[in-house]
Amino acid sequence: MKYKYSTVLLKLSGEALKSENEIYNKEKLEDIAKQIVELAKNGLKLGIVIGGGNIWRGKLGTDIDMPQINADYMGMLATVMNGLALESTIKRLGYDKVNVYSSLPIETVTDDYNFKRARLKMNEGYISIFVGGTGFSYFTTDTNSVIRAIEIGADAVLMAKNGVKGVYDSDPNLNPNAKFYKKLTHREIAENQLRVMDLTAATLAKDAKLPIEVFDMQGQNNIIKVMEGSLESTIIEE
């Protein structure tokens, strides 16, 4: 199978794993895992970063007067749980070549992160799931996605959105006349304050000349379709 990239970093939101009333939805987990397995079996080298928003959000910490540092680490731990959920689903589907690398040492259930080891294992067909954020507070999973993408030599970051096909000049759910962008530069993201990712992540991607493709994952096989180049999306590159 011919894909538009050979190595990618897939950024998933935690919300992509949940249902209305449950933090995990079996069907959604299996759908994502099946697509990931198909891509890996067809030779794609794949790294994955998952958010933790289905379990923990910073606002919850604010509501109980928790210091941001503590709240950030709780968010990082939520990504560990999501990574383990995705790993177990992938393995249940019969694909055992998957590693979970954590920036926070949790030796019983994850591997300590080392980019050289991750690259070697990815060359052997292993899927790498990166959890625990950067390991430091005040940094988002967007920033972690860009850092890991650079470290594994990814051709691009695939940023999966829920129900939005790419980047608009305003919220399309609130503004029916919102303008959709097919192509943007990293500089335009910052200058126009477009809500794609945080400024730190956008700046890192710009400096590394790392393309970012934003797409809607809510559709049958949309992760595969974006890799095949058959899905409408927004591409951010210099």
Swiss-Prot record:
A GO cellular component annotation in the UniProt record: cytoplasm
Lineage: superkingdom: Bacteria
Keyword Cytoplasm belongs to the record: yes
Pathway the protein takes part in: Pyrimidine metabolism; CTP biosynthesis via de novo pathway; UDP from UMP (UMPK route): step 1/1
The protein's name: Uridylate kinase
Annotated compartments: Cytoplasm
Keyword annotations of the record: ATP-binding, Cytoplasm, Kinase, Nucleotide-binding, Pyrimidine biosynthesis, Transferase
GO molecular function, one term: UMP kinase activity
Subunit structure, as described in the record: Homohexamer.
Regulation acting on activity, per entry: Inhibited by UTP.
Main localization of the protein described in the UniProt heading: cytoplasm
Family stated for the protein in its record: Belongs to the UMP kinase family.
Gene of this entry: pyrH
Function of the molecule: Catalyzes the reversible phosphorylation of UMP to UDP.
Residues at which UMP binds: 52, 72, 134-141
UniProt organism field: Mesoplasma florum (strain ATCC 33453 / NBRC 100688 / NCTC 11704 / L1) (Acholeplasma florum)
Organism placement in taxonomy: Bacteria, Bacillati, Mycoplasmatota, Mollicutes, Entomoplasmatales
Record-level GO BP terms: 'de novo' CTP biosynthetic process; UDP biosynthetic process
The keyword Transferase is annotated on this UniProt entry: yes
EC number: 2.7.4.22
